[in-house]
Amino acid sequence: MSNSLSTAVQEVRPTQALAPKAKSMDPTIACDLYRHAGRVDFLTLLRYLLHNPSFRFTYFFRKASQQKTHSPLQFFYKILHRRYLYKFGFQIPLSTKIGKGLYIAHFGNVVVHEDAVLGDNCNLTHGITIGRTNRGGRKGCPTIGNRVWVGTGAVIVGKITVGDNVLIAPNSYVNFDVPANSIVLGNPAKIIPKENATLGYIESVMDSACSC
C-alpha cells in the first residue's frame, strides 16, 4: 500500500492510552465504536448505545451474530436485533458477513442481502440496497472489499466483486465488477480510477495496536 493510500484510510489513529481499553472490549465492536466515536472506552460505548441508533443496531447485530449456542443470552440479543431492525429501518440479517469497523452514517432504509459479504471499515448511508440478482450470468450477491464507501441511494446487485478503497457515489447503480482504488458514479455507472478514492470519507480506522 502506498504512503498516500495508507494516510487516506488511517487518518485518525488511536493513542497508546486507548489501546488497553480497546483490548478489554470485543475487537470487532471496538472497531465499530472507533469508527463512530474516534475513541474506545466503556463510557463512550454506553453513550453511543443510548444516543446513536446506527451504532446501537450494529452493536446488537454483532452480539446476536456472534452467539453460536442456543442460550438465553443469544435469544435476548436476537430479540433486540429484531426490534431495532424494524424500529430503525434496517434490513441486515444476522447471517450477513460484515467485517469489523462498520459505520452506518444515517439510520433508515438500509438493505443488505443475507448472502452479501462486506469487508472491513465500510461506510453505509441511508437508502442503499446491496442485493441479489436472481437470473443471468451474475446471479447471486455482491462481495465488497475493505474501505468501501456507499453513497445515499446507491444500488449494488449481482454476483460481483467490489475492490478495496472504492467510493460508490450517491444514486449509482452497480451490477459489474469494480477494481480497487476507484470511484463509481452514475446510472449507468462509470468507473474513475483514483488511488485515494475514499480520502475524507473512510476515517477513524483502528490499527493493529488496538487488536483490531
Residue map of PLM features:
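Left-handed beta-helix
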Residues: 88, 94, 99-100, 105-114, ...
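A generic structural signal for ordered alpha-helices
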Residues: 37-45, 62, 70, 76, ...
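Terminal amphipathic alpha-helical/low-complexity segments used for targeting or macromolecular assembly
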Residues: 1-88, 199-212
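Conserved beta-strand-loop-alpha-helix hinge in the C-terminal portion
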Residues: 182-184, 188-202
